Amino acid sequence: MKLRPLHDRVVIRRSEEETKTAGGIVLPGSAAEKPNRGEIVAVGTGRVLDNGEVRALAVKVGDKVVFGPYSGSNTVKVDGEDLLVMSENEILAVVEG
C-alpha cells in the first residue's frame, strides 16, 4: 500500500532508535525515547492559501528532518511499518550534509 498525504501533510519514517547508551548500557524498548528524526517518504501537494493558490512544500521526499517530541501523533501502519503523518509546520528543521 502507498500513502499519498493531502495538502501540507507529509509521511515520515522514523529513524532507528538508539538502544544503547554512550556507556554501553542496553535500554529496553519501554525506556528508550522515540527518536525525533526521520526521513520523508511522501509529501502532499501543498498548503492552500486564503486566495486559493497552492504553495508548494519546502521539504521533499528523501529529506532527513527533525521534529518535536509531540509532533506526528498520527501513526499509520503500512506493510507492517509504522509511519508518521504530520503537517509540514510540525517539522523543525531539515538535516543537511
Curated annotation (Swiss-Prot):
GO terms, molecular function: ATP binding; metal ion binding; protein folding chaperone; protein-folding chaperone binding; unfolded protein binding
Single GO BP term: chaperone cofactor-dependent protein refolding
Localization of this protein: Cytoplasm
UniProt key word Mitochondrion: no
InterPro entries linked: Chaperonin_GroES, Chaperonin_GroES_sf, Chaprnonin_Cpn10_CS, GroES-like_sf
Main location: cytoplasm
Record-linked PROSITE patterns: CHAPERONINS_CPN10
Pfam families reported in the protein's UniProt record: Cpn10 (PF00166)
GO cellular component: cytoplasm
NCBIfam families linked: PRK00364.1-1, PRK00364.1-2, PRK00364.2-2, PRK00364.2-4
Assembly and binders: Heptamer of 7 subunits arranged in a ring. Interacts with the chaperonin GroEL.
Name of this chain's protein: Co-chaperonin GroES
The species this protein was found in: Pseudomonas syringae pv. tomato (strain ATCC BAA-871 / DC3000)
Gene: groES
